[in-house]
Amino acid sequence: MRSRHSPSNRHRFRLFASLAPALAGFALLLFGSAAGAVDPDSVFHIDRNKNRNQVHYGVHLDQDCRPAGPEPVYNYWLRREEEPPVVRPLTYFQQTAYGFQKQKIENDGRIEVRLRALPDRQLVVRVAAVGGACKAETFMTIDGKQAYLDKVFVFAEEGYFVPAVRYIELYGRSNDGVAVYEKINVGD
């Protein structure tokens, strides 16, 4: 029997939701955000079928909303399976699946990124100052259309040594706000 003072799952979720911006800010400090930088929240994330944990991707920016450092896009775990949810860095082994193949900053400030999880797809992170705040968005081709990337879903089955990815789903929206979706079959 639950006491009247014990929090329900709904209250825990509300508490977490209210703390999420602070946790994201803590993650930026923890993972080496440059002093004085103005890093926006996660620009997209990867969900998986294994559990509710997510891999998030953010971008380090300077005070003028320009990419900070030679490899400004970074990743981290949002461990939603833990109580309360926590932010953690990816391990070396996890970076081999969810890390970066390359990052390149173009003269106009765009950041071209290739992920190990999507090696055949180029992602472009664009950053702008909007209303005094830095705003970053990720673009890529989804179902043959240039679109904003919202999230990636990876479905994998347990293998002998490592999970075997069966398919990847891309979720985004076109410039006019219409939802776009693509499923990429990977496994047999």
Residue ranges of model-derived segments:
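N-terminal secretory signal peptides that target proteins for export/translocation
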Residues: 1-17
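Bacterial N-terminal signal peptides
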Residues: 18-31
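N-terminal export/targeting and maturation segments
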Residues: 35-91
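Hydrophobic beta-strand residues in large extracellular and virion-surface proteins
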Residues: 46, 113-115, 123-125, 168-170, ...
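Mature extracytoplasmic domains of secretory-pathway proteins
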Residues: 77-147
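Beta-sandwich interaction modules
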Residues: 145-159
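Short, exposed beta-strand-loop hairpins at the edges of beta-sheets
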Residues: 159-183
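Short, solvent-exposed mixed-charge patches
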Residues: 186-188
